[in-house]
Amino acid sequence: MQFTHLVALALALATSEAAHQGFNYGNTKSDGSAKSQADFQAEFSTAKNLVGTSGFTSARLYTMIQGGTANTPISAIPAAITEQTSLLLGLWASGGNFANEIAALKAAIAQYGDDLAKLVVGISVGSEDLYRNSVDGVKANAGIGTNPDEIVSYINEVRSTIAGTKLSGAPIGHVDTWTAWVNGSNSAVIDACDWLGFDGYPYFQNTMANSISDAKALFDESVAKTQAVAKGKEVWITETGWPVSGKTENLAVANLANAKTYWDEVGCPLFGKTNTWWYILQDADPVTPNPSFGIVGSTLSTTPLFDLSCSASSSSSAAAAASSTAGPSASSVIGGKASGFTTAAANSAKPTFTVGKGPGGSYNGTGFWNSTSSARPSSSAISGSSSGSAAGSSGAGASGASGQSSSSTGSSSAPSTSNILSNAASGLSGSIFGAVVAVCLALAAL
């Protein structure tokens, strides 16, 4: 095999293994006004060029519908096409408007075709609907939810809708709080999904020790709980973050220093390893919510409020991050390998407090779980589960490639060049570094 062919194959393998890192984006601003294509495009461009990062080039959407319309496709799609930002599409599944979500999905496929298809990472049917439908969600006044049977029905409807279209290869999942995922009554939704979306916010876990020093452990443990029930399916981090300002939740203090610590300890190990959409790029335009999670302020800028660079000691190298945020391609999106947590954890995990944002921010409910499975309203003096924010804004996220390890067959015969290359690239999580190492190993075997 020629050297140029080896390099091309290595880079192709790295691209196909690369995960996605980006932010969550609602269809309105924080005052409820609808975002335009220009608004989305400005956000996507800013995310790609954030100082201290290799760029956040993926967007998670909550709805297919443009703000202020019945079922017109969201203008984030043409903005993403212009900016080459990959998309985790979302269909809002609570409140009885799903037919319009399907209509918008069909219209988007017809209007944008291949240009859309090459950007789609996956499709999320709903966001925290199961939590809002739970006893805890009802107690917390979290908003209208949906039962698991209906979510399964909606997932099947989306599968039928995209069958035979440009999006036929898109993996379909559902996003919810980890407490919803570990609830056995929701297991049918897990069965229906190709992947599980995890929302988790230790900041809101105000019935437990939730200082910034506890945050990483709380986050990791709640992810492990979700992994344990995922039945081998990938778990994508669809929402997490720490506020830069706002009220204190028990021991959790909202400030820039703690937001930076959470980014370093939780975000950096995810970036370049697991599909992750951070909350949030900007939530203070034009009104600053309490709490505010935006990593940029009220004025959109590529200069963040705190340092976003990840140190070399983090598990994600700059090279891996560069690979994970390269422009999307057909191989790395539809038909490519997704990247997420797949290893089920046997250890018990502490619960994590989680938050969801509805399309356009009309909902900002927050769910939590504790040993007594009780929920308390945050608007009261007692620590609670509802963030109570009416601000509308979209979230943010980051992503990375999933790690895979190749196993030895025990054969004494020399492995083939193609096997060395494939296994090396896979075992090194699809990073550019992994691709380079794979090439070197392949050349050594010649």
UniProtKB/Swiss-Prot annotation:
The topology of this chain with respect to the membrane is: Lipid-anchor; GPI-anchor
Q: Residue ranges under compositional bias (Low complexity)?
A: 401-416
Cell compartments where the protein resides: Cell membrane; Secreted, Cell wall
How is the polypeptide modified once translated? The GPI-anchor is attached to the protein in the endoplasmic reticulum and serves to target the protein to the cell surface. There, the glucosamine-inositol phospholipid moiety is cleaved off and the GPI-modified mannoprotein is covalently attached via its lipidless GPI glycan remnant to the 1,6-beta-glucan of the outer cell wall layer.
User: Which BP terms in the Gene Ontology apply to this protein?
Assistant: carbohydrate metabolic process; cell wall organization; polysaccharide catabolic process
The main place the protein resides is membrane
Which is a Pfam family this sequence falls into?
Glyco_hydro_17
Q: What class of enzyme is it?
A: hydrolase
Signal peptide extent: 1-18
Record-listed E.C. numbers: 3.2.1.39
Give the residue spans that cross the bilayer: none
* Active site location: 128 (proton donor), 239 (nucleophile)
Keyword RNA-binding tagged: no
Renumbered to this chain, region (Disordered) spans 393-416
What is catalyzed by this enzyme? Hydrolysis of (1->3)-beta-D-glucosidic linkages in (1->3)-beta-D-glucans
Q: Which UniProt keywords apply?
A: Carbohydrate metabolism, Cell membrane, Cell wall, Cell wall biogenesis/degradation, Glycoprotein, GPI-anchor, Hydrolase, Lipoprotein, Membrane, Polysaccharide degradation, Secreted, Signal
Q: Which residues are glycosylated?
A: 183, 364, 370
Residues excised as propeptide = 424-446
GO terms under cellular component: cell surface; extracellular region; fungal-type cell wall; plasma membrane; side of membrane
GPI-anchor amidated asparagine lipidation sites on this chain?
Answer: 423
Q: Name one GO molecular function term.
A: glycosyltransferase activity
The reply to whether Cell membrane figures as a keyword in the UniProt entry is yes
Q: Which family does it belong to?
A: Belongs to the glycosyl hydrolase 17 family.
Question: What's this protein's function?
Answer: Glucanases play a role in cell expansion during growth, in cell-cell fusion during mating, and in spore release during sporulation. This enzyme may be involved in beta-glucan degradation and also function biosynthetically as a transglycosylase.
Return the protein name.
Answer: Probable glucan endo-1,3-beta-glucosidase eglC
Source organism (scientific name): Aspergillus fumigatus (strain ATCC MYA-4609 / CBS 101355 / FGSC A1100 / Af293) (Neosartorya fumigata)
Traced from the root, the source organism's taxonomic lineage reads: Eukaryota, Fungi, Dikarya, Ascomycota, Pezizomycotina
Q: Which gene encodes it?
A: eglC
